Amino acid sequence: MARTLMKPDDVKGAWAIIPTPAKDDASDWRATKTVDLDETARVVNGLIDAGINGILSMGTLGEAATMTHDEKLDFIKALVDAAAGRVPIFVGTTCLNTRDTIALTRQALDIGADGTMLGVPMWCAPSVDVAVQFYKDLAEAVPEMNIAIYANPEAFKFDFPRSFWAQVAEIPQVVTAKYIGVAHLLPDLAAIRGRIKLLPIDFDYYGAARMDESIDAFWSSGAVCDPLVTTTLRDLVSQARATGDWSAARAFMGRLGPTAAPLFPNGSFKEFSTYNIALEKARMNAGGWMNAGPVRPPYHLCPEPYLEGARLSGRMWAELGKALAAEK
């Protein structure tokens, strides 16, 4: 049976981006079948029960670059089975070339994933023409698969310029994008003309929502440190939109914002990107809501002071979650 594609307006609220839970031996290159499938199911159910609107997976912190093909298929099946159609599940299928990406995306579709979170092949830094054609080819090959563009310039050696957004907005399968920063948000929104729902990170959501009414969804890796923090942000911004009173949302950002600082070594996104996986998993493990497990090689090495900053970030997020629960 043919599936109906999502529309940008179908993407709303708080979307959690999750790690791929790893078994205890996952940092050993000899390890096989490293995905903790039981923890995967528990996390998906916990996020849905907490009110999360959608789930993104198998990005950078999701270790798509270091999972085996069989592990990816096992993880996708665990995600889809646990969600059971209750929220959209987008899975990363980016590979180093178009044909492998198409093959994995077809397999994800057959398993039941709702969409792919798709970056661009990065062995050679892509030109705009190459990047746009990559998405066009994927949409032609797997026309029933929704696409979330994974716009991470550090990971993919690509700046995702305005000319790129203007062209991919013409692809019906491209319904949303995991978006970073707000410096270019307004011109990028003008380029996409309402055809793609841009998702800023949780720390930018308040500011982005104040800038443009179309910003009514965001992504959050902190959701797996405690989803109550993420859903509280969503609900406070929604209430502010309804009432015109942004004071509570602004005050909440004063509590949420400081949790980000320790995550970024020397305040640098570039430095963070070098150790992204190890830092995010350290943060999540310290948060205590889930067991993200160890990091798969070769990205399991990270300076200890950087890891301690990430752990502090996770503990701060978790403490905020406990405070919010006590205030209810």
Swiss-Prot record:
Signal peptide: none annotated. SMART domains: DHDPS. It is an enzyme of class 4 (lyase). Optimum pH is 8. It catalyses: (3E)-4-(2-hydroxyphenyl)-2-oxobut-3-enoate + H2O = salicylaldehyde + pyruvate. One of its GO terms (biological process) is naphthalene catabolic process. Involved in the naphthalene and naphthalenesulfonate catabolic pathway. Catalyzes the transformation of trans-O-hydroxybenzylidenepyruvate (THBPA) to salicylaldehyde and pyruvate. The reaction is reversible. Can also use 2,4-dihydroxybenzalpyruvate (2,4-DHBP) and 2,6-dihydroxybenzalpyruvate (2,6-DHBP). Belongs to the DapA family. This is Trans-O-hydroxybenzylidenepyruvate hydratase-aldolase. It comes from Sphingobium xenophagum. The lineage of its organism: Bacteria, Pseudomonadati, Pseudomonadota, Alphaproteobacteria, Sphingomonadales.
